């Protein structure tokens, strides 16, 4: 992949190009766009977001078969904003959000906020999050533990609910 200016970019390049006119502020989306350019075949055309709800909400994003982000959120509003940014800018045939069932009140809040704020369809899967928390030697690495739990949640199966935007269902 070559990163260049729009002016210097050849019109018919044999290798993937990323030009400087890209105006993506979300690093996860930028990583996803780079993967899109590099993956011509798209063997796995899916976007999977794993969420470990709690005081510190773990977050993991898998796109085209690769993990492109892993982070920690202290507020649900910031989490929802980032999920909406990712869902709206990364295109995939299958878009799935997997949420752990450890805090169902928070799981339902996340689901409802996504349904209210995002005007497109996606699937939500509530998964059993037992045994997703790994033992970490140093107590101060709890954020790392929540992010790893989100990754494990994104790899589990559960009950899938298709969410249609309220604008389509009334």
Residues of each region from the PLM?
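Phosphate- and other anionic-substrate recognition elements at nucleic-acid/protein interfaces
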Residues: 1-48, 55-170
């Amino acid at each position: 992949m070559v990163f260049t200016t729009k002016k210097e970019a050849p019109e018919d390049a044999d290798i993937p190009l990323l030009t400087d006119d890209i105006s993506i502020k979300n690093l996860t989306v930028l990583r996803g766009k780079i993967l899109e350019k590099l993956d011509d075949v798209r063997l796995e055309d899916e976007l999977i977001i794993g969420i470990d709800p709690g005081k510190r909400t773990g977050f993991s994003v898998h796109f085209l078969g690769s993990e492109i982000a892993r982070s920690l959120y202290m507020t649900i509003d910031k989490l929802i904003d980032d999920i909406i940014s990712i869902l709206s800018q990364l295109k995939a045939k299958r878009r799935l959000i997997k949420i752990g069932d450890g805090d169902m009140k928070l799981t339902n809040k996340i689901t409802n906020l996504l349904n209210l704020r995002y005007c497109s369809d996606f699937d939500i899967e509530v998964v059993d999050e037992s045994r997703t928390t790994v033992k970490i030697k140093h107590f101060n690495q709890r954020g790392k533990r929540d992010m790893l739990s989100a990754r494990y949640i994104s790899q589990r199966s559960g009950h899938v609910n298709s969410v249609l935007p309220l604008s389509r269902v009334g």
